[in-house]
Swiss-Prot record, chains A, B:
Name of this protein: Putative hydro-lyase SPO1111
EC number in record: 4.2.1.-
Pfam families hit by this protein: D-Glu_cyclase (PF07286)
Family to which the UniProt record says this protein belongs: Belongs to the D-glutamate cyclase family.
Matching InterPro entries: D-Glu_cyclase (IPR009906), Putative_hydro-lyase (IPR038021), UPF0317 (IPR016938)
Ligase among keywords: no
GO terms of biological process kind: glutamate metabolic process
MF (Gene Ontology): D-glutamate cyclase activity
Organism listed in the record: Ruegeria pomeroyi (strain ATCC 700808 / DSM 15171 / DSS-3) (Silicibacter pomeroyi)
Keywords, comma-separated and alphabetical: Lyase
Length: 275, 275
């Protein structure tokens, strides 16, 4: 039996996770589990894990690490009391040799004892804070995906992982730009402060209405385009590295954790019991 | 020729690093390289690096990771333009099989192609911010080492690394406690907000005047003991893991980086050129 988005919007975290785990809900997670941290996902063989972790440490704005599993253990015990990464994300992309091989609602069959799970913070957290401050975000109000661009900023490489930084764009009234930058800087686990604002040409972006990913968003009169480091950056780096196996969330279909959005550190109290 | 502390206090970063690299300066770094991030150090064989990095990610308050080297590469290119970790720390402790084997001003002879360097943020950064706000710190004013205690807080384990959290204590006037907590929370790369304040018994500390490390510090009238996660925590976890080889800085003798103390991310701009 499938469960609808509107009903889950008011569900408890436990009901929400049960609906996703059973496969009853397989759609996007924007607006669900409000108040809790959501995460991008990258699952890799252990042979690549140290280099990928170094890539995240060296590029903390596009790749804010919020959780790393033990090798071969699908339970993300630092992010929640009962999160099984094989079933608790609505939809997964499975890549083999750098190419998308399948899309699935359950990766139990793909799981291996040498896999390591990386959870990365996402932009929902700072967007909520910006909207609470009374700044409207066009893509949210119009139910579109935020526009994303390949920038001319080079990431700091680690092992096989490298590439240009992908950025997301949000248009903000000129007199709120400094305030929005300051608000987002307080969320280092959700990409932090913008990397740039103003003329898109400064990032090597020729046409602001032709994003490389997501939907185009208009610039209203008196609005300034602000650009944040984006979680698509590590996905592009992973694809370019052509790993034999890599599993990610399907874009927009995130892991919902037990960690409060305003937590200082992304570790639940029960994590200490898992010795 | 040795160089004195007082002269180096006003030296440029380049002069300071040259004096340390040549062995002319082998003493503590408190008050040197003002305005730049200083770091605790742990150098381990690659076989333990992924687990240690997971330990840091799971315990970000005692173990705030600010830099990780490539395996076998002694140049810390994300933390500075020209930092050679074999020579650029005033003094090192070399541990073999979990026991202190030697203290040295240069580890060029100990370097191996399988070593990975971890640099961790230290408390100097938030202490500077607290003092700028006009709150005096007794151990700084009296040229002592901050008192440190083994607490009853369990860290989140990863592989062979586990143990109790070590905390450092600073006495703060009751009416400044909330402000000091807020100031330090803004420095997640320097241990962040305190983990506790008030009656030391709550952390399992029997006698506040008998620290496990450092010097005792008095509690003045109207002062509250505040406790922060401490960088000795990973050193204790590493010692307990009895690694065949581990090299740390000698306590107080830190790595001085090129990263500004108030930088949003601990990565210098030239890091991108090191592909």
């Amino acid at each position: 039996m499938s469960v609808g988005y509107d009903r889950l919007k008011t569900s408890s975290l436990a009901e929400l996770r049960a609906a996703i785990r059973s496969g009853a809900y397989r759609s996007h997670t924007a607006g669900l589990g409000q108040g809790y941290l959501q995460a991008n996902l990258a699952i890799l063989p252990e042979a690549y894990a140290l280099d990928f972790m170094r890539y995240c440490q060296r590029n903390p704005k596009p790749c804010p690490l919020i959780g790393v599993s033990d090798t071969g253990n699908p339970m993300m015990f630092t992010l929640g009391r009962d999160i099984d990464i094989r079933t608790d994300v609505p939809a997964y992309n499975v890549y083999r040799d750098g190419r998308l091989d399948s899309v699935s609602a359950d990766i139990t069959e793909d799981w291996r004892d040498d896999l390591v799970v990386f959870a990365l913070g996402c932009s929902f957290t700072f967007e909520h804070a910006v909207m609470r401050a009374g700044v409207a975000l066009w893509h949210v109000d119009n139910d579109r995906t935020v526009p994303m661009f390949r920038s001319n900023i080079e990431t700091v490489p680690a092992g096989p992982f490298s590439g240009k930084m992908v950025v997301s764009m949000r248009a903000v009234p000129e007199d709120r730009v400094a305030e929005v930058a300051e608000i987002s800087r307080a969320y280092p686990l959700a990409h932090g402060a913008p990397v740039y604002w103003g003329d898109p040409a400064g990032l090597g972006i020729a046409d602001i209405m032709s994003p490389d990913w997501g939907d185009p968003a208009p610039l209203g009169p008196g609005e300034v385009p602000m650009f944040w480091a984006c979680g698509v950056t590590p996905q592009v780096a992973i694809e370019a590295a052509r790993l034999p196996l890599c599993i990610t969330h399907k874009p927009g279909h995130m892991l919902i954790t037990d960690v409060a959005e305003d937590a200082e550190v992304p570790v639940v109290e029960t994590a200490q019991d898992k010795r």
